[in-house]
C-alpha cells in the first residue's frame, strides 16, 4: 500500500499556486538591476525581491527526474563562504548554502509555506516579523504540501522507522500540538495567568518560538503576570510609537509601569483577552494559534428567550391580536362604549322569541341595522348622520369572533314577521328620508365641484403655458448674461496681464538704463535705491545659480550640450551622452578608466 502511494507521489507533479511558484522560481535568484544603478529603495532595510550582494544569492531548487533535489534541503555545505557568497563547487554543489536569511532552505521545495507562521499579520496582511516575503503560511489557503525527494519517500515505506525517526515530518508542529493538548493550557484562566510570563529553556533551534511557545524568548515577547503586576490595557507611550512596539527597556519605570509594554501584554490583558472575534476563524474557519489565540473562537449566545421570540412571531403572523373575540364588558374601551349605547334607551335589542346564530360559512352581513329596534327616529337619524363618514361605525360583525365568520346569518327560528316589522319601521322613519336627502345633497355638491374643477383646470393649463414661455425666455437671457460675464472676466485677465507685463518691461528698462550708466550714476543714487538694486541683483544671481546647477546635472560633462544617457563601468556614473561615449577613455567625474559603457 505504501509502495503504491510512493509511486503516485513520484509520478504526479504538484500544481503550485501562482504566488508560490513565483517565489520558488525567482526569489533572490537574479541580481537587482536598480541596485547596480544606485536606485533601489529597498536596500536598507533589505526587503528587495532580488539579491544585492553575492552572499544573498539563492539557487533555484529543482527536483530531478530521478526524484532527488539539485541540492539538499537539510545538509549545509562546509565549504561555502558566508561572507563572500562563494562556494568552490559553484552552483553544482549538492548541499545547502547558508545564504543571508537562510533563503535556500526556507524557500526550498521541501519547506516553503509548509508550516504555519507563528507570528501575526499587520493591517496590510504582511507578517509582523518577516514582512512581505515571509516563508511560512498565514492561513490554510496560504499553506502548500511539501515536495519530498526519493530518500524521504523510501523512509515513509517503513512505518516503524518513521515513528522512531528523529527526522519525523513536521517535528516542530508535532511538538506544538503536544503543547496545545496539555490539559492545563486548555484552561483560559491558566493561559491568562501564565502565558509568556516565564523564559523558554529550550534551545532556539528546537523551539518554534512566537505564539506557539507559551514562554517568552526576548524582551518584546515577554509578558508581565497580571497577578504580580497591575497595569492598564493601554500601551505605554514610551514604548509604542504609532503602530510599532519598541523595546520595553525604553520605559524608565520598568516592570512597575502602569501601561502595557508589549503587544502580548495588551492582547492577553484581562480587560481585552477574548473580547473580540478571531478574524482567522471568521474568514477561514481555522485558527493556527489554537489555545494560544487571544481572540474569541465561539459565537456569543443570544440573550433573548426563544420562547418569547416564538410567541411574538406567532402573535404577529396571526390575527389573534386584531381579530380575537374578547369579553364585551371590558371597561373604558370603544367596544364596551358601543355596546352600552346599543343597550341603553331606544337602541335596545328586542326581538322576542328569536335567536341569532353565527355561521362559519357566511362572510356577508345581511343587515347593517339588523339588531336595532326602532324607539326614537330622531336619535337614530342623528346617529347615522354623525357616523356616515366614520369607518368605525359599530356593526355586529365587529364584535363577533372571527372563528364564526365576518357577518350574521339568520337562523330559521327567526320569524319572518319580525324581520318585516323591522324593515317597515326603518322605512317609515326619518332614517330613510335623511339618508336620501344626504345622498342627493352629496351628488349636487359633487356636480358643482366637478364643473368648478374643469374651469380651474383650463385656467391652470393656460397659466402653466405662460409660465413655461416666460421661463424659457429667462433661461435664454441667463445664458446671454453668463456669456457676457465670461467675456468680461477674460478681458479683465488680459488687462491685468498687460499691466503686469508693462510694469515688468518698465522695470527692465529702468534697470538697463541704470546698468548702462552704473559707474557714473551710482554715487548719485540714494541709499534706498542702492539697496533695491542690490536686492534685485542678488535675486537674479541666485536664480542664475539654480538654473546653472540643474543644467549641469542633466547635460553631458564633456560636451555640455546633450543630455546624459550613458553609464560608465566600473564606476557606474551616468555622466556622458551617446555622442561622447565613442571617444571617452576615462570617466570625467572620477577619472577612472572606462571598461565598458551601457545606456
Swiss-Prot record:
It is found in: Cytoplasm. Disruption phenotype: Flies exhibit an 'unkempt' appearance: small rough eyes, held out wings and crossed scutellar bristles. A zinc finger (RING-type) spans 556-591. GO terms for molecular function: DNA binding; zinc ion binding. The modification Phosphoserine is found at residue 411. Ubiquitous in most somatic tissues from syncytial embryo through to embryo stage 15. Expression becomes restricted predominantly to the CNS at stages 16 and 17. The keyword Zinc applies. Keywords: Cytoplasm, Developmental protein, DNA-binding, Metal-binding, Phosphoprotein, Repeat, Zinc, Zinc-finger. GO terms for cellular component: cytoplasm. GO terms for biological process: chaeta morphogenesis; compound eye development; imaginal disc-derived wing morphogenesis; larval development; neuron differentiation; regulation of neurogenesis. It comes from the Eukaryota. A zinc finger (C3H1-type) spans 71-100, 111-141, 194-220, 230-264, 272-300. The keyword Metal-binding applies. CDD domains: RING-HC_UNK-like (cd16614). It holds the Pfam family zf_CCCH_5. Essential for late larval/early pupal development. PANTHER family: RING FINGER PROTEIN UNKEMPT (PTHR14493:SF50), UNKEMPT FAMILY MEMBER (PTHR14493). Belongs to the unkempt family. This is RING finger protein unkempt. The gene is unk.
Amino acid at each position: 500500500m505504501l509502495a503504491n502511494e510512493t509511486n503516485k507521489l513520484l509520478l504526479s507533479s504538484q500544481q503550485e499556486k501562482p504566488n508560490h511558484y513565483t517565489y520558488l522560481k525567482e526569489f533572490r535568484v537574479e541580481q537587482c538591476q536598480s541596485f547596480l544603478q544606485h536606485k533601489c529603495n529597498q536596500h536598507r532595510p533589505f526587503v528587495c525581491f532580488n539579491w544585492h550582494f553575492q552572499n544573498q544569492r539563492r539557487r533555484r531548487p529543482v527536483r530531478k527526474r530521478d526524484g532527488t533535489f539539485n541540492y539538499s534541503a537539510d545538509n549545509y555545505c562546509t565549504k561555502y563562504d558566508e561572507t563572500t557568497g562563494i562556494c568552490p563547487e559553484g552552483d553544482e554543489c549538492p548541499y545547502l548554502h547558508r545564504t543571508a536569511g537562510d533563503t535556500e532552505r526556507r524557500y526550498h521545495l521541501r519547506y516553503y509555506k509548509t508550516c504555519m507562521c507563528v507570528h501575526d499579520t499587520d493591517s496590510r496582511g504582511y507578517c509582523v516579523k518577516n514582512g512581505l516575503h515571509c516563508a511560512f503560511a498565514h492561513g490554510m489557503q496560504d499553506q502548500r504540501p511539501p515536495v519530498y525527494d526519493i530518500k524521504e519517500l523510501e523512509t515513509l515505506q517503513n512505518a516503524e522507522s518513521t515513528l522512531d525517526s528523529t527526522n519525523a515530518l513536521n517535528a516542530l508542529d508535532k511538538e506544538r500540538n503536544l503543547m496545545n493538548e496539555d490539559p492545563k493550557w486548555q484552561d483560559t484562566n491558566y493561559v491568562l495567568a501564565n502565558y509568556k510570563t516565564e523564559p523558554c529553556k529550550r534551545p532556539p533551534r528546537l523551539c518554534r518560538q512566537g505564539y506557539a511557545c507559551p514562554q517568552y524568548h526576548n524582551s518584546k515577547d515577554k509578558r508581565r503576570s497580571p497577578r504580580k503586576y497591575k497595569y492598564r490595557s493601554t500601551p505605554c507611550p514610551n514604548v509604542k510609537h504609532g503602530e510599532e512596539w519598541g523595546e520595553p527597556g525604553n520605559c524608565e519605570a520598568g516592570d512597575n509601569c502602569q501601561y502595557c509594554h508589549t503587544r502580548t501584554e495588551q492582547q492577553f490583558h484581562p480587560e481585552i483577552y477574548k473580547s473580540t472575534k478571531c478574524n482567522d476563524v471568521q474568514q477561514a474557519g481555522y485558527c493556527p494559534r489554537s489555545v494560544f489565540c487571544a481572540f474569541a473562537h465561539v459565537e456569543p449566545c443570544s440573550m433573548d428567550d426563544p420562547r418569547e421570540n416564538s410567541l411574538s412571531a406567532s402573535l404577529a403572523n396571526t390575527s389573534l391580536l386584531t381579530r380575537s373575540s374578547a369579553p364585551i364588558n371590558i371597561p373604558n374601551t370603544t367596544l364596551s362604549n358601543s355596546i352600552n349605547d346599543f343597550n341603553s334607551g331606544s337602541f335596545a335589542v328586542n326581538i322576542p322569541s328569536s335567536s341569532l346564530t353565527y355561521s362559519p360559512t357566511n362572510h356577508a352581513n345581511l343587515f347593517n341595522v339588523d339588531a336595532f329596534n326602532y324607539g326614537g327616529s330622531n336619535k337614530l337619524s342623528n346617529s347615522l348622520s354623525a357616523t356616515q363618514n366614520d369607518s368605525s361605525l359599530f356593526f355586529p360583525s365587529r364584535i363577533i369572533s372571527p372563528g364564526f365568520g365576518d357577518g350574521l346569518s339568520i337562523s330559521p327560528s327567526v320569524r319572518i314577521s319580525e324581520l318585516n316589522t323591522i324593515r317597515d319601521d326603518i322605512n317609515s322613519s326619518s332614517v330613510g328620508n335623511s339618508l336620501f336627502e344626504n345622498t342627493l345633497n352629496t351628488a349636487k355638491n359633487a356636480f358643482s365641484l366637478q364643473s368648478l374643477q374643469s374651469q380651474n383646470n383650463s385656467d391652470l393649463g393656460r397659466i402653466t403655458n405662460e409660465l413655461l414661455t416666460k421661463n424659457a425666455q429667462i433661461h435664454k437671457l441667463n445664458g446671454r448674461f453668463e456669456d457676457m460675464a465670461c467675456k468680461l472676466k477674460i478681458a479683465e485677465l488680459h488687462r491685468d496681464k498687460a499691466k503686469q507685463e508693462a510694469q515688468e518691461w518698465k522695470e527692465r528698462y529702468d534697470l538697463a538704463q541704470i546698468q548702462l550708466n552704473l559707474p557714473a550714476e551710482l554715487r548719485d543714487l540714494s541709499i534706498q535705491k542702492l539697496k533695491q538694486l542690490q536686492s534685485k541683483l542678488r535675486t537674479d544671481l541666485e536664480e542664475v545659480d539654480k538654473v546653472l546647477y540643474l543644467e549641469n546635472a542633466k547635460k553631458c560633462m564633456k560636451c555640455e550640450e546633450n543630455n546624459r544617457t550613458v553609464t560608465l563601468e566600473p564606476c557606474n556614473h551616468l555622466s556622458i551622452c551617446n555622442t561622447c561615449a565613442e571617444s571617452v577613455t576615462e570617466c570625467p567625474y572620477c577619472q577612472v578608466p572606462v571598461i565598458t559603457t551601457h545606456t
